[in-house]
């Protein structure tokens, strides 16, 4: 019984980054493109470089999760379906939704969940790309949903 209590305590102490503290939200905006999104600034505290296009990468302080918020020109005026097809996503995608205005895809790679959503507006593609530990998937559900649904651009 004592070992069960120790295990429960260890699990409680190692709570996920996503649920350990109340989440502080801010609005992140890419000034050059108008891309914006609700951003959990209390989770993604470290800048982690820039993508090849407009935007920024961030990671958690412990490096277990990362996010890229970016915007890129839609040079070939692709629809979400055409753009996604050109990226050759893996065949074993767990979640896929494609509409005339956006796509969202998610699956597992090694011990991580990856989630990508891209909204199409005019000549720009506005995206959020998130990777986080698969063992914390349920703790991240509401956070990922809020970020995804708040993604917008002009």
Language-model segments: what does each one mean?
Residues 22, 45-142:
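Conserved polar/disulfide-associated segments of primarily extracytoplasmic proteins
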Residues 21-52, 151:
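N-terminal "mature-domain start" segment
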Residues 14-16, 39, 147:
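Generic detector of short, well-ordered, non-transmembrane alpha-helical segments enriched
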Residues 1-4:
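Positively charged n-region of N-terminal signal peptides that target proteins for export
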Residues 140-153:
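Short, low-complexity, Pro/Ser/Thr/Gly-rich segments in the mature regions of secreted, periplasmic
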Residues 6-19:
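Hydrophobic h-region of N-terminal signal peptides that target proteins for export
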Residues 14-16, 25, 34, 67:
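Intrinsically disordered/low-complexity terminal segments and short unstructured peptides
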């Amino acid at each position: 019984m004592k070992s069960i209590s120790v295990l429960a305590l260890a699990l409680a102490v190692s709570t996920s980054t996503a649920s350990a503290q109340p989440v502080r939200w801010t609005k992140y905006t890419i000034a050059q493109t108008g891309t914006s999104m609700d951003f959990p600034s209390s989770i993604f505290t470290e800048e982690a470089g820039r993508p090849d296009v407009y935007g920024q990468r961030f990671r958690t302080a412990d490096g277990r999760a990362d996010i890229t918020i970016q915007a890129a020109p839609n040079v070939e005026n692709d629809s979400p379906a055409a753009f996604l097809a050109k990226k050759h996503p893996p065949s074993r995608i767990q979640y896929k939704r494609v509409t005339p205005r956006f796509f969202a895809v998610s699956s597992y790679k090694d011990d991580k969940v990856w989630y990508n959503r891209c909204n199409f507006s005019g000549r720009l593609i506005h995206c959020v790309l998130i990777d986080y530990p698969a063992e914390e998937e349920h703790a991240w559900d509401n956070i990922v949903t809020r970020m995804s649904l708040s993604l917008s651009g002009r």
